[in-house]
């Protein structure tokens, strides 16, 4: 279920700042048609930090509704307070999701034991599969491989999204974690190499606008056809990098609007529109990727 090309989906807004459910449905259909393997709803790229609890739950539920069982939906449920993460899990438990993606607690910098206890508490509240999410560049805490290995022994903790960009960890996680534990890259620029080293897929920002190419690349890689996959990856490499020229999801939301995938490219403060100097840089990356 959790492998291949998984999109970290953007959350579209109307000009007055409300969630744009018409564009959201269009995005879901776009990914179904492109062969995307799963959708992460309301993760970091989906601006989870600026949605209310009610909006968060509704966006996930509507994404499940729009998918109509055509691909699995994974709900972002991270929080820096364990009780809040548990509450999200409870609220989303009956929405039809296939799993939770739970980022490490941010800002308060827990110890490794604190991380273990945090995720253990979440796992005890649900039978739905939990995907760990390690992104120290955003959270200021790094979940070490030893902690991931301990957590992998918990029945419904089934996968890790590793956005460290440290490819040496693939082998460490593969060696230390229980058999069958899924490793997913959270870094587009190194995602293909991650799979080559033993990962099972990528949770991708690039996928928002290059869904068919990302799906084809990941499926080739999982079939062991790395030379063919590398050709696609090389064409997308500038895009992988330039979608982070400003804080994500600022560039990818601008690109999605430019391509007509969403009706409006606005974000919620404190995130702002892509700056004027950055726009031609992202536009050039779209051109080099041959997707617009």
From Swiss-Prot:
Classification via Pfam families: DHDPS (PF00701)
Assigned keywords, A-Z: Amino-acid biosynthesis, Cytoplasm, Diaminopimelate biosynthesis, Lyase, Lysine biosynthesis, Schiff base
GO molecular function: 4-hydroxy-tetrahydrodipicolinate synthase activity
SUPFAM superfamilies: Aldolase (SSF51569)
Record-annotated active site: 133 (proton donor/acceptor), 161 (schiff-base intermediate with substrate)
Enzyme class: lyase
Quaternary structure and partners: Homotetramer; dimer of dimers.
Family: Belongs to the DapA family.
Protein name: 4-hydroxy-tetrahydrodipicolinate synthase
Taxonomic source organism: Vibrio cholerae serotype O1 (strain ATCC 39315 / El Tor Inaba N16961)
